[in-house]
From Swiss-Prot:
Catalytic activity: RNA(n) + a ribonucleoside 5'-triphosphate = RNA(n+1) + diphosphate
HAMAP family reported in the protein's UniProt record: RNApol_bact_RpoA
Enzyme Commission number: 2.7.7.6
Transmembrane segments: none
Name of the molecule in the record: DNA-directed RNA polymerase subunit alpha
Known role: DNA-dependent RNA polymerase catalyzes the transcription of DNA into RNA using the four ribonucleoside triphosphates as substrates.
Cross-referenced Pfam families: RNA_pol_A_bac, RNA_pol_A_CTD, RNA_pol_L
Alphabetized UniProt keyword annotations: DNA-directed RNA polymerase, Nucleotidyltransferase, Transcription, Transferase
Entry domain remark: The N-terminal domain is essential for RNAP assembly and basal transcription, whereas the C-terminal domain is involved in interaction with transcriptional regulators and with upstream promoter elements.
């Protein structure tokens, strides 16, 4: 009798439009579609890391229940509009940005002054409208976070936010706007009682739907791994992988076993890595910045590109991996 549980053999990602995608996985054993679909949906909506404006200081404004001469919106509406700006920070956890504009016209996210490592995903988003003689001067603090954090929690927990004129915002860090899933029928040979999981995701553009699913699955794996250690058991022992066999690779995050070609680096960067026998992402993250800079033809620009691509997947250079490479990993 077959005792092994089926696992998906195909994963298809279909782009449905701007920042929307459908991820289809099949086949699953009966019931696993709902089990995993619901878990993924909850994690995607509640636990994804993102960026949001958390504090604002506006020149001439002492509190949010104010109005500004020459600005059509009151301060409350300006703050609500500001929450709609989608930020993305590269290699940093927080930043303070400036917005200064005067004269009649529309103030958009494009008017926010940003350094090279801060990206605004929706630069045409409207923040305020200025009348003739109007002026808007504000400082915006953007932070990295997870989920939703009410402003009153931060207001009373951080002494630095108690200065007059500093307005603390409710922060919705999650880059995932909507998630739905459906379970359909799947078939493998003579079995017709299997599940196909269809997950539809809409993000704010700071992360792709595919990366969001990957990150949420990683969170679930890390949380469930705790149960594998009950009674002092070793996580690795749960998988019953034969020593030296291909199953040894299951101890590593699957993304580490992928070729560096999937990072979609520039041709120059990719060729430099291959020249150093760096074929897998697991090989790459173990190298330090200094080691990579010693690579012929790989300069600071290529290094920054590599760091940004890794950071988008929750990885960094200089990480340590025990027992790498896993036995059975194909050598190229």
């Amino acid at each position: 009798m077959q005792t092994n549980l089926l696992k998906p053999k195909t994963i298809n990602v279909e782009q449905l439009g701007h920042n929307r995608a459908k991820v289809v996985l099949e086949p699953f054993e009966r019931g696993y579609g709902h089990t995993l679909g619901n878990a993924l949906r909850r994690v995607l909506l509640s636990s994804m890391v993102g960026y949001a404006a958390t504090e604002v200081t506006i020149a001439g404004v002492l509190h949010e229940y104010s109005s500004i001469d020459g600005v059509q919106e009151d301060v409350v509406n300006i703050l609500l509009n500001l929450k709609g700006v989608v930020f993305k920070l590269h290699n940093r956890d927080e930043v303070t940005l400036s917005l200064r504009k005067d004269g009649e016209g529309v103030v958009t996210a494009r008017d926010i002054q940003t350094p090279h490592d801060v990206e605004i995903i929706n630069p045409d988003h409207v923040i305020a409208n200025l009348s003739q003689g109007g002026k808007l001067d504000m400082q915006i603090k953007v932070e990295k976070g997870r989920g939703y954090v009410p402003g009153n929690v931060r207001r009373y927990g951080d002494e630095s936010t108690k200065s007059i004129g500093r307005i603390v915002l409710d922060a919705s860090f999650s880059p995932v706007k909507r998630v739905s899933y459906a379970v359909e029928s799947a078939r493998v040979e003579q079995r017709t009682d299997l599940d196909k999981l269809v997950v539809e995701i809409e993000t704010n553009g700071a992360i792709t739907a595919e990366d969001a699913v990957r990150a949420s699955a990683k969170i679930l794996v890390e949380q469930l791994a705790v149960f594998a250690q009950l009674d002092g058991g070793d996580i690795a022992s749960v998988f019953d992988a034969p020593a030296g066999g291909r199953g040894a690779a299951t101890a590593f995050d699957p993304i580490l076993l992928r070729p560096v070609d999937e990072l979609e680096l520039t041709v120059r960067s990719a060729n430099c890595l291959k020249a150093e026998n760096i074929y897998y992402i697991g090989d790459l993250i173990q190298r330090t910045e200094n080691e990579l800079l010693k690579t012929p033809n790989l300069g600071r620009k290529s290094l920054n590109e590599i760091k940004e691509v890794l950071a988008s997947r929750g990885l960094t250079l200089g990480m340590k991996l025990e027992n790498w490479p896993p036995a059975g990993l194909e050598k190229r």
